[in-house]
């Protein structure tokens, strides 16, 4: 079941998506504030209103937590211990995809730090998300539409695979995998491996919602077909993928500090960072 269908099913069962919508911002934090002003040329005194107006309009159509809680202006990619490697590789010509990129906000961070836009790709199921990214950052003249692909990662006949299969060097996946159950996560990650070049050094960097309390995990699985990992299940997932693909994959994991989880209604939630490198 896709995220849209999951949300509709939850609403039908009594879930109120408005609990995901926080109050309007009074301050837009760095680094996105400077990116909006310098790269998107939005006047400094208009930035807060610009972000609030876009959030309200987007949430009315897509009542997702990432929109209601302004996650699209809380950039996190630069906090990854692998960010410097990703940035330098892209500057030297490697191709990077942000999978489930939403408004493409992390790609704008890479661009602001000097990554060539033509080496960056973003993909999301919703074309409207990609369009909203342009409305947020006002940077269409410097970030070609051809770099953003509306596609379903589960569909190997989609434009994403037609254009990029076997060509990518790095795939970044942030707060995306948890909306799938275990089996779908396996399929998503196998498909991601197919998008990557079949060469040593191909890299996946993940930011995953995780949970320390198995009772909370089980309750979440009953409510919606999400799969929130703990460290053991994450390692088990990659053991299964190694077995299924016969690939040599080195998996690094760490706990990544993140303000987002402070707002999460479930106890024991944290962000698990991981990097998976092909050998």
Swiss-Prot record:
Pathway(s) annotated for this protein in UniProt: Secondary metabolite biosynthesis; terpenoid biosynthesis
SUPFAM superfamilies: S-adenosyl-L-methionine-dependent methyltransferases (SSF53335)
Binding-site residues for S-adenosyl-L-methionine, renumbered to this chain: 124-125, 152-153, 244
InterPro entries cross-referenced by the UniProt entry: Meroterpenoid_MTases, SAM-dependent_MTases_sf
Record-listed E.C. numbers: 2.1.3.-
GO molecular function, one term: methyltransferase activity
Gene3D superfamilies in the cross-refs: Vaccinia Virus protein VP39
Keyword line: Methyltransferase, S-adenosyl-L-methionine, Transferase
EC top class, as a word: transferase
Role: Methyltransferase; part of the gene cluster that mediates the biosynthesis of calidodehydroaustin, a fungal meroterpenoid. The first step of the pathway is the synthesis of 3,5-dimethylorsellinic acid by the polyketide synthase ausA. 3,5-dimethylorsellinic acid is then prenylated by the polyprenyl transferase ausN. Further epoxidation by the FAD-dependent monooxygenase ausM and cyclization by the probable terpene cyclase ausL lead to the formation of protoaustinoid A.
Family statement: Belongs to the class I-like SAM-binding methyltransferase superfamily.
PANTHER family with a match to the protein in the record: METHYLTRANSFERASE AUSD
Note: In A.calidoustus, the austinoid gene cluster lies on a contiguous DNA region, while clusters from E.nidulans and P.brasilianum are split in their respective genomes. Genetic rearrangements provoked variability among the clusters and E.nidulans produces the least number of austionoid derivatives with the end products austinol and dehydroaustinol, while P.brasilianum can produce until acetoxydehydroaustin, and A.calidoustus produces the highest number of identified derivatives.
UniProt subunit comment: Homodimer.
Protein name (Swiss-Prot/TrEMBL): Methyltransferase ausD
Gene: ausD
